From Swiss-Prot:
Protein name as annotated: Pancreatic polypeptide prohormone
Record InterPro entries: Pancreatic_hormone-like (IPR001955), Pancreatic_hormone-like_CS (IPR020392)
Coiled coil: none
GO annotations of cellular component type: extracellular region
Keywords from the named record: Amidation, Hormone, Secreted
Family: Belongs to the NPY family.
Keyword DNA repair attached: no
Propeptide boundaries: 60-66
Gene name per UniProt: PPY
Listed CDD domains: PAH (cd00126)
Superkingdom as given in the UniProt entry: Eukaryota
Length: 66
């Protein structure tokens, strides 16, 4: 993971604060961006396989569903 930017202090110049704000924004975006990897692959394949013979058969509604 990227390192969190260091706060320049209360006496920092506006340029230093702007630099810190930009680095902090990049850092937060990096931590919160969606990840598309092996774990997501299962969900996307389900959509593609709707018509395949391996798709789960629709089940009857149970009393719990009603």
């Amino acid at each position: 993971a990227p390192l969190e930017p260091v706060y320049p202090g209360d006496n920092a110049t506006p340029e230093q604060m702007a630099q810190y704000a930009a680095e902090l924004r990049r850092y937060i975006n990096m931590l919160t961006r969606p990840r598309y990897g092996k774990r997501d692959r299962g969900e996307t394949l389900d959509i593609l396989e709707w018509g395949s013979p391996h798709a789960a058969a629709p089940r009857e509604l149970s009393p719990m569903d009603v």
